[in-house]
């Protein structure tokens, strides 16, 4: 999982990326291509 300051550019890298908020953190999840997982931090 990548940890980035800004997820906006990462979200555009794959069309199945979803932006979700869990426990006060922002994540990108991708069920079809899990290598795009990322967390903002």
UniProtKB/Swiss-Prot annotation:
Source taxon at top rank: Bacteria
GO cellular component, one term: ribosome
Pfam annotation, one family: Ribosomal_L36
Keyword Ribosomal protein: yes
Keyword flag Lipid metabolism: no
GO molecular function: structural constituent of ribosome
InterPro entries according to UniProt: Ribosomal_bL36, Ribosomal_bL36_sp, Ribosomal_L36_bact
SUPFAM superfamilies with a match to the protein in the record: Ribosomal protein L36
Similarity comment text for this entry: Belongs to the bacterial ribosomal protein bL36 family.
Protein name, per record: Large ribosomal subunit protein bL36
Originating organism: Mesorhizobium japonicum (strain LMG 29417 / CECT 9101 / MAFF 303099)
Gene expressing this chain: rpmJ
């Amino acid at each position: 999982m990548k940890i980035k300051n800004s997820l906006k550019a990462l979200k555009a890298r794959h069309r199945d990326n979803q932006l979700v908020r869990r426990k006060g953190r922002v994540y990108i999840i991708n069920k079809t291509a899990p290598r795009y997982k990322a967390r903002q931090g």
